[in-house]
């Protein structure tokens, strides 16, 4: 079978809780999850698949159909989040219209939450839920060995399939993969130069993953209290060397909290130093998982920024979100990070249930006092299957399971709902714009950014983002 791994064109994605001013212009991140699946398939079968990533390549629907005509794939595999479900379904319909015999398989975070609901959609033939690397290859191998007997598919855990138009969902695969057994993502199938991010430190950006899972209990997160696993320092640094040889000099570790296992992270940093690898990189971390030893190792090995999930200045709202941290811990961690010579990005949240306008603006002031390189103020949103969503349903704040309804009946007019009883969506969006304007328009912040500009393209990119933030506040 000829396999096409596809990231569909972006045209009807659901609007997120991030402000419109910051949604565009940030660049494109590689789809590592799908690249891992492609790499496992290639290693296991010896066959080289095709990988088309439409957004960074600027590929339109018409151009995609032309490329598919040339490739003539038997199976098209896409990894989807809830935000791009509509894009995936629209693309599936377009492909099936041209090629009725083509098979469509969907995997990814949305499918993990709603496997049957996704499979029930027309034009979808298979779904993979759970860690898809091994499951997808088992699906293809089974189809190739005995395509006349679909019953053979029922033994593959983590697979959904159809028989006579009826959806069949197999048992969940509960055995987790050994991360050191994973092949490196199939970056050789894409044009690495197409991936960029405007607030990086190097010429060529790409992403990498060293861990999976997070033991923290944040109620708004979909991987809340999941098993934390990590790769060996040798495996991670071998991959970094491969990326450097491909021309990459700016990495983002997409791990939710890479700092959970401090010793393993420090060993990884030390190995980067021992091998003399010159790389710029950034990570994400909780404020209660760093110390001076970790920060020193990160700085020496090339880390230039840490993304902290801070959320709020209010102890009661941090408790409501089950963050497990306090404003004092946040201040201490940010101070240590600055002292170590590492920048940081502050992820903040407004519109938390029962939060007042005064508390939201206090969170902005708190963020300004922390002196981060950047801050983002998202509107608190109960995403599907999260503890926050269930908690808000239990409190009667959310009166209907609208995410379930969307999973069953995806529609273009669907809008994310924010749930603070004291504010309308329009009021929250306006407050969000005001928060960003208050943070980014301060004289001290502007002067700090001017002194850090590395080049004219860097200046113009940041200026465009700043202009978007300010004009959004003025309603332009």
Model segments located where?
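Short catalytic helix/loop segments, enriched in acidic residues and glycine
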Residues: 20-41
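N-terminal [4Fe-4S]-dependent radical SAM core
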Residues: 1, 9-18, 156, 161-210
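Catalytic cores of alpha/beta
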Residues: 115-120, 294, 354-369
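Radical SAM [4Fe-4S] cluster-binding motif and immediate context
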Residues: 180, 184-347, 352, 365
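Radical SAM enzyme core and accessory elements
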Residues: 3-5, 12, 46-48, 65-69, ...
């Amino acid at each position: 079978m000829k396999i096409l791994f596809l990231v569909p064109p972006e045209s009807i994605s659901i609007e997120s809780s991030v402000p419109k001013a910051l949604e565009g212009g940030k660049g494109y991140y590689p789809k590592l999850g799908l690249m891992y699946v492609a790499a496992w398939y290639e290693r296991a079968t010896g066959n080289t698949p095709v990988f088309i990533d439409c957004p960074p390549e600027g590929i339109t629907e018409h151009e995609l159909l032309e490329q598919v005509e040339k490739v003539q794939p038997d199976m098209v595999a896409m990894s989807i989040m809830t935000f791009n479900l509509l894009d995936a379904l629209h693309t599936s319909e377009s492909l099936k219209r041209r090629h009725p015999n083509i098979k469509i398989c969907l995997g990814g975070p949305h499918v993990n939450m709603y496997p049957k609901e996704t499979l029930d959609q027309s034009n979808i033939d298979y779904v993979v839920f759970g860690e898809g690397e091994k499951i997808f290859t088992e699906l293809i191998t089974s189809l190739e060995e005995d395509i006349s007997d679909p019953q053979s598919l029922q033994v593959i855990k983590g697979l959904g399939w159809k028989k006579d138009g009826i959806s069949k969902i197999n048992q969940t695969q509960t055995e987790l993969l050994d991360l050191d057994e994973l092949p490196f993502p199939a970056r050789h199938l894409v044009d690495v130069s197409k991936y960029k991010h405007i607030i990086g430190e190097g010429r060529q950006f790409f992403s990498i993953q060293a861990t999976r899972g997070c033991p923290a209990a944040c109620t708004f997160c979909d991987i809340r209290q999941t098993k934390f696993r990590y790769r060996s320092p040798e495996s991670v640094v071998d991959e970094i060397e491969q990326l450097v040889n491909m021309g990459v000099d700016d990495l983002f570790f997409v791990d939710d909290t890479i700092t959970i296992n401090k010793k393993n992270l420090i060993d990884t940093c030390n190995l980067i130093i021992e091998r003399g690898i010159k790389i710029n990189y950034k990570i994400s971390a909780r404020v209660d998982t760093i110390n001076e030893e970790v920060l020193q190792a990160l700085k020496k090995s090339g880390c230039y920024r840490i993304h902290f999930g801070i959320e709020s200045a209010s102890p009661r709202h941090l408790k409501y979100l089950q963050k497990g941290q306090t404003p004092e811990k946040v201040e201490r961690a940010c101070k240590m990070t600055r002292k170590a010579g590492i920048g940081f990005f502050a992820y903040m949240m407004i519109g938390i249930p029962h939060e007042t306008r005064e508390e939201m603006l206090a969170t902005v002031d708190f963020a300004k006092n922390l002196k981060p390189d950047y801050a983002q103020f998202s509107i608190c949103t109960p995403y599907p299957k999260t503890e926050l969503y269930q908690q808000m349903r239990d409190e009667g704040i959310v009166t209907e399971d609208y995410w379930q309804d969307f999973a069953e009946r995806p529609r273009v007019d669907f809008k994310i709902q924010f749930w603070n009883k004291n504010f309308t969506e329009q009021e929250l969006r306006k407050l969000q714009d005001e928060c960003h304007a208050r943070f980014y328009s301060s004289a001290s912040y502007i002067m700090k950014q001017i002194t850090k500009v590395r080049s004219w393209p860097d200046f113009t990119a940041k200026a465009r983002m700043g202009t978007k933030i300010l004009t959004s506040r003025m309603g332009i």
